[in-house]
Amino acid sequence: HDICDSQLDNEQVSLAGNNEEGFVPGIVPEFYRIGGLYKDPNWNGACVFTPWAYYQYYGDEAVLRHAFPVIERYLAYLDRQTTNGVLENYAQMGEWGEYGEHTPNVLVATCAYYRMLMIAKQICEILKGQKENKLDEKAKLYEAKAKAVRDAFYHHPECYDEATGQFGTGSQASYAIALFSGMAEEHEEQAVKALVEVVKKNGYHLTSGEVGLKQVFTALAEAGYSDVVYQMVMNPTAPSYRVFADTGLTTLPEYWNYDELWLGSMVRSRNHAMMGHVREWMTSFVLGLRPQS
């Protein structure tokens, strides 16, 4: 099904939310802000991630060209939010919806920032025919900035432990987010092995939230471990997608422990698309329908 028109409309709205500081809100138009939950690069960064995903599937350079000025302003804004090169004490949502394991916000946010810088570099290289915008120079600047962020990440105690090779807290998401973003490129083999081990240690149960879930599935599948993803998805005990289906749910809850929250004082959404990453895994890695490069 061709959804390019609707996605393009959504992207236009997102870009229009860019303010004079370069900030892009998580809700556009920004009729209101949800208390302390309005700034996080994995949400606000849709202004970078969405046009890039659109280009990967449709090959439309015009979308990148239109989005790039906003991307530049947003990345400049994020740079001003860093402390010693990382996004510390900035992201408000982090690994939203995580269950049983915690992943540090600084790791989640900084990996997102690093990934955006590398995307910006690639966009510059794709559009570099526009010499008046000095995109060759900008590509080098984004690459240098990404390297600086990477170096800072590896020197932050909540992001990486050089003595043990552990990312973050050693959670599923800690390893997967570092792998997916490219931050763990030099330690890929060890990080993948550690990710598989922590999944097995958790009895093939899902512990990742909204950000890490897609990245856990992707990191495992790209390394040839779709069998591990399958066991997680079909796990007969909670939390798992199979348990959702066996319970009779026809929509996705916001949290893995939706039943506890539903019966308690915090009634949360039971119609939330954010945990739907299993569908992308099935399409991309089971059916094999994904971009070639």
Regions found by a protein language model. Give the residues of each.
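Active-site core of glycosidic bond-cleaving carbohydrate-active enzymes
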Residues: 1-293
